[in-house]
UniProtKB/Swiss-Prot annotation:
It comes from the Bacteria. Substrate binds at residues 79-80, 122, 160, 164, 195. Mn(2+) 2 binds at residues 42, 79, 114, 195. It is an enzyme of class 3 (hydrolase). InterPro entries: Calcineurin-like_PHP_ApaH, LpxH-like, Metallo-depent_PP-like, UDP-diacylglucosamine_Hdrlase. The keyword Signal does not apply. One of its GO terms (biological process) is lipid A biosynthetic process. Pathway: Glycolipid biosynthesis; lipid IV(A) biosynthesis; lipid IV(A) from (3R)-3-hydroxytetradecanoyl-[acyl-carrier-protein] and UDP-N-acetyl-alpha-D-glucosamine: step 4/6. This is UDP-2,3-diacylglucosamine hydrolase. It comes from Coxiella burnetii (strain Dugway 5J108-111). Keywords: Cell inner membrane, Cell membrane, Hydrolase, Lipid A biosynthesis, Lipid biosynthesis, Lipid metabolism, Manganese, Membrane, Metal-binding. Its EC number is 3.6.1.54. The gene is lpxH. It is a peripheral membrane protein.
Length: 243
């Protein structure tokens, strides 16, 4: 049956070759069978600018380019790769999506988000997010030498890890009130997002109507994909390959 695939939170980096191998397997064996592929943020562990053309980044860009030649491929930036820009889109052939975006998925309106904006109890991250999403801040960051951007990215990742270790389970997750607010505002019955690394299908009720929130999984020890079929059925699928 015709279907569309959704992935997020691969956190690709040169230091995790097993995850890269799983992504390349996904491109070869799963993506070609889909109508379209949506990547909902944190595709990279860190992205410091489209001008950072390392051999590893070129490899990933070329793999996306091959995919996008034959399949519509959509890319939403996350909090780890928010500096991805139009040059990356031109090099890969992906279409950039704003966060949030409502798409028509087999004639059904579906809200797509990375998901970090839903974690409103994490006040420190929300303050950080408000800063980094300002166009002038991004322009300033991209004006810095690559060597300095690498150092800053490393520093930010270390700070993020320390911060996450201090948070309780609930603070790291989305808040139901924000989920309800956003879904009401966008007038949708289905929300798909990543970020929290807690793959699940949540049944909700909004304005007396049954709704769903699907959370994509992170690629820690293997692949994680949402397969959404034309008939409205869907499944979160995990896979692992022998390396």
């Amino acid at each position: 049956m015709r279907h569309t695939l959704f992935i997020s939170d691969l956190h690709l980096e040169e230091e995790t070759p097993s995850i890269t191998a799983h992504f390349l397997y996904f491109l070869k064996h799963q993506a070609p069978k889909a109508d379209a592929i949506y990547i909902l943020g944190d595709f990279f562990e860190a992205w410091i600018g489209d001008d950072n053309q390392t051999p590893f980044n070129r490899k990933i860009i070329e793999s996306l380019q091959t995919l996008a030649r034959t399949k519509p491929t959509y890319f939403m930036r996350g909090n780890r790769d928010f500096l991805i820009g139009q040059r990356f889109a031109a090099m890969t052939g992906v279409s950039l999506l704003e966060d949030p975006s409502v798409i028509q998925l087999y004639n059904k309106p579906v809200l797509l988000m990375h998901g970090d904006s839903l974690c409103t109890l994490d006040h420190k991250h929300q303050a950080y997010r408000r800063k980094i999403m300002k166009p002038w801040v991004q322009k300033l960051m991209l004006s810095l030498p690559l060597s300095l951007r690498r150092k800053l990215a490393k520093k930010f990742r270390e700070q993020s890890r320390r911060h996450n270790r201090t948070l309780s389970y609930g603070i790291k997750d989305v808040t139901p009130e924000e989920v309800n607010r956003v879904m009401k505002e966008q007038n949708v019955e289905l929300l798909i997002h990543g970020h929290t690394h807690r793959p699940a299908i949540h049944d909700l009720t909004i304005n007396g109507n049954p709704t769903k929130r699907i959370v994509l999984g992170a690629w820690h020890h293997g692949g994680s994909v949402l397969r959404y079929a034309q008939d409205g059925s869907f499944e979160l699928q995990a896979f692992k390959i022998d390396l």
